[in-house]
């Protein structure tokens, strides 16, 4: 096979990248073309994303690829975080910055909607984990508040769909990102119009759902001219970053659980059909769309967000730590002294994460962590124990064997947390690839254009092209006692 080039745009809640993938003789090489910061913008008391700035950064990435690297990619694809969306008017113009999912306007939306549509019914109809920022609740909050923005909204597009639209001029909703909305019929490409209309959301604002691996069209003449590009297809990859990441799990057997570790930790299994029952509702599991007819049965766990936030607060206070330095502080601190529930709502978007952690520990009669090392150790111990808790829940509701955990994404670089996770769960850990989302994005493009044949073939290429690190459980610490303490303070 001659070298084939694909450009992935991978946007996260804190940064975005343009990554060039070179596929050559079943080996994949990655080159970072462009990197930029992303953060929520606080404007008039609400949090927004600056989609116009983000699109400019993506165009810069394409321009660099063409002009600085001298490469015309065969295609481009975009993935982002889930649930957030853009409003367009009837002329097809974006009429507002999109709200960010951590905005407080949805704080009461779940309970308010349950007065109209009972929680049990909503879960049975969608199979999606209840989180106050799901698109369903964001839209319902706007309907409930009689938002003037809704009155002039002709269509909505989720973040990757909106960026695809800006590139191609084509409005579609890709399956994996649409599934995060809590508004589709499980395992299908159909909107749940019964639920949508019960929530008062105008059904006509929703776009046709397409499967990942659909060619939307070519970049517009305007984009081509601005970036110096030739005609390039825009492919709707798995627009939800986690869905793209799971594609790159380097395992060809169906005996694994995964943790896609970044700002969020997404932990689950890949299955053919949704798991929807009263038990999965009570455990608050989600069934999101995957690639190749798969369902991502998983739970969203607050992940590196906790570390990112304490790091940010301490930097504002004049103490700047690198990630390795923070790990070393944790390593030197006493294990299991303080434990938190990472998913407690008080950690969603506090003004001071360090104080929020101290408050939780105080309220659960543990005392309070004083040193930075104690705070960091508390976070890492608690995440590892949360992974064990989630693993046991998955095993309770599914008979799918789990013999290994694959940790992918940026968190795969955290060898300290990986070892804690192996110790806590008693399972072998395989860490890598770290650029899982970009790899999945790229390989879906390659499959769409006929250069790769199947999901299994993709995963073999990833395994052959990646440096993987393995972690084996140790019994140096009493994790069973720690787990029992964790249950006492978090349940």
Regions flagged by a language model, labelled:
Residues 1-96, 124, 224-234, 425-427:
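N-terminal glycine/serine-rich phosphate-binding loop of ATP-dependent small-molecule kinases
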Residues 44-48, 119-129, 205:
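Short glycine/proline- and acidic residue-enriched helix-loop micro-motifs
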Residues 47-55, 128, 132, 209-213, ...:
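Short acidic-aromatic active-site loops that bind/stabilize oxyanions
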Residues 72-80, 155, 208, 400-409:
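Short glycine-rich phosphate-binding loop at a beta-alpha junction
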Residues 79-83, 212-213, 261-264, 404-412:
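Glycine-rich beta-strand-to-loop/alpha-helix junction loops that act as flexible
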Residues 200-212:
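A conserved helix-loop-beta module that forms one wall/lid of the active-site cleft
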